[in-house]
Swiss-Prot record:
This is Sperm histone. The keyword Magnesium does not apply. GO terms for cellular component: nucleosome; nucleus. Testis. Residues 1-57 are annotated as: Disordered. Keywords: Chromosome, Developmental protein, Differentiation, DNA condensation, DNA-binding, Nucleosome core, Nucleus, Phosphoprotein, Spermatogenesis. The lineage of its organism: Eukaryota, Metazoa, Chordata, Craniata, Vertebrata. Disulfide bonds: none annotated. Protamines substitute for histones in the chromatin of sperm during the haploid phase of spermatogenesis. They compact sperm DNA into a highly condensed, stable and inactive complex. Its main location: nucleus. GO terms for biological process: chromosome condensation; sperm DNA condensation. The keyword Nucleus applies.
Amino acid sequence: MARYRRTRTRSRSRRRRRSRRRRSSRRRRYGRSRRSYRSVGRRRRRYGRRRRRRRRY
């Protein structure tokens, strides 16, 4: 997080423009499927971690 903050304050306008352009292209390519896949992966990972810890202990 600290690293991201530093770069953001350093070159704000330049980075903002670049990220915006990249984001739009990415959205067109993946679309809605990527968002759902990401959320599902996150949920599954969290659940798996919790289960593992419980079993170990």
